[in-house]
């Protein structure tokens, strides 16, 4: 801490100002405000962070001493002002709590009571954010014995005013000789660390991490130092290196990483104007700019900053894991432990952990840096890697160079890992944490810590990739196989499972580089296959999967799966059933590894439908596609069988069906046609709109809720319907719009409730929806009000220009309107209003919400059911949509395209 800093605080000048004022409050406030401005200017100018936070602690020391001296303490030998916690370490950020202990020598302290109250009142009056306790030495001992937090705070203490002897007495009665011996303290702190990590999902890669509490945050470093203090009496990284628990290079890395997080935390406090340790979206962009990151780089400033953040916390996490394991091996060592068992000439087991047989293992036989992970996969009983061996791995990873990467021993070992029955994900994760994976595959190293600034991808690219491999492994486990029955079945019969793991490893490896990441990744995958001398068929499949890993999900979510041509085109692209099986499994794992909330019954049903229809097309032969007439005949025949069995008159059925048109039978299953037909035939002629709600857990759209509406067609039908659904808090995922020749509309919507789940068997909720829709459609002139809902906080920070594309379908008489835009409450209802204003008819729709963005496709016609052909009309439509999408947002540009 600085000895003196007149620019920050001039003691003589301050005392002179105090003497001139009747009340000291104004002088204290002025001194604190001016000093804060000086420190903030130094920070903004790029000053080193460590002197800044130490200077703030020094400033507060002086302020507290001056405040303490404002009161008559009488016999000062019995009272002391002690800094504890972070302030006790001499570290203060702009709005950190100032933790104080007013330490008393005796239980009888009535003589100090009035002065203590007035002192604390003054601190609050001058604006200091103080956390205080008043305890005797004996009370400190009693509470420290019972509370881990109290003993931890007391270990970090400094005397600010009063006799140092009191603090020394307190340290003596709370020492390891009296309480919390190092072993007990270590176990408690380790449990506390695990619980804290679990609170943050056991990942360093949260979208809005806590720089203090998240894994790899400042609290991890403090935990290491607390344990070291209890065991060795040392409380800084340099001293820890002196004890042999850190190499000097590791000490420097940990210190620089701590400095980086201190900068981020300082900036957070400064920007928020309060104590804030959450790196919220609200602040990420501003901090990136403040710390000097620029959008001129191919990556945006915010993505550069967050990648640096994630790499730093990963480094901290790795080193703290290493030190904690060292402590574990030393502090928890059993006198009778130490049994070893050789695995081979290079490795042995030590109390269940693998360790190098000698310090030169990796230097003499570099291939052992891969072999160790294969051994752990082959021996699942191994608990982990000994700390000294982890350090040896870190020290020798520089030996992994181009020569190493092409050595047949190394390439064979790497492929061998992917052929192991268990442990693939666990050991790839270890390889990543120890820095081996990114050295062996430099292209993987590029994606470590790389975050995409959106709500769709909630993990960094490397974490997502390893999660995908974890999901592939889970597909073989019974609890998961029940959730993903088809994917689990296919995973179990893939001819070479290792190929899907390798494709998964490379599927997103091209991200962060300019260009199509699927194409870039395919090039990298091809080079990998060549270097590892994989057979030609294996190589072709891996490269094809990487290149096409998005095709199935895109087709399922954006194309009309009831169109035989869509199925035939997709089948033609896939080519054979083996590729289809691999692609389906990879797609399911990819979606679940991207963001668990993305996987719902609706997406599951779309993928399953696309898989099933494509498989039928492949087995039938691509040269024999199922034509429209054949599909219609099959649907009608099956539906009629169902209806006749239920006693419905076939003549009535035929009469109704003659009015419905071909599209209806192409867009619905036979079971749904039978369900609709039965209800329509029973509907009274003047019964108003028919609204059917059916839970579809046993049907094509498993888990989604199907709403079927049959009513006289009217100009504003779609607009009224979606506005009413918006009021009912329903999320629309699919819309199938049909108008019969008798001018009745037959609309089917697949919806999920506001929380992403199906409506279920809640009769009250079903009745609420049925009544709400029926009332809205019965009285369309009372157009439902589009509720102005608050935009969620996180969505506000993902404002990007909407993309609106209008083009005519070469195969069908419709115009395709594609919209990509920031997700906002009531967006679909607003689009419905625009369709109404432009006199448009909606034939079909595909709705997809991906994090903070929507990607919707609408198939529209004009009032005469013809494709849009007027360029000026399309331009006005595009302008109206963009204006509506940008209403209340910061975007002022858009990307549009009109094609005929």
Swiss-Prot record:
Activity regulation behaviour: Uridylyltransferase (UTase) activity is inhibited by glutamine, while glutamine activates uridylyl-removing (UR) activity.
Catalytic activity reported: [protein-PII]-L-tyrosine + UTP = [protein-PII]-uridylyl-L-tyrosine + diphosphate; [protein-PII]-uridylyl-L-tyrosine + H2O = [protein-PII]-L-tyrosine + UMP + H(+)
SMART domains assigned: HDc
Residue span of region Uridylyl-removing: 343-705
Record GO terms (molecular function): [protein-PII] uridylyltransferase activity; phosphoric diester hydrolase activity
Cofactors named for this entry: Mg(2+)
Residue numbers spanned by region Uridylyltransferase: 1-342
Sorted UniProt keywords: Hydrolase, Magnesium, Multifunctional enzyme, Nucleotidyltransferase, Repeat, Transferase
Domain notes for this protein: Has four distinct domains: an N-terminal nucleotidyltransferase (NT) domain responsible for UTase activity, a central HD domain that encodes UR activity, and two C-terminal ACT domains that seem to have a role in glutamine sensing.
PANTHER family (UniProt xref): BIFUNCTIONAL URIDYLYLTRANSFERASE/URIDYLYL-REMOVING ENZYME, BIFUNCTIONAL URIDYLYLTRANSFERASE_URIDYLYL-REMOVING ENZYME
Family assignment from sequence similarity: Belongs to the GlnD family.
Protein name: Bifunctional uridylyltransferase/uridylyl-removing enzyme
Organism of provenance: Pseudomonas putida (strain ATCC 700007 / DSM 6899 / JCM 31910 / BCRC 17059 / LMG 24140 / F1)
Gene: glnD
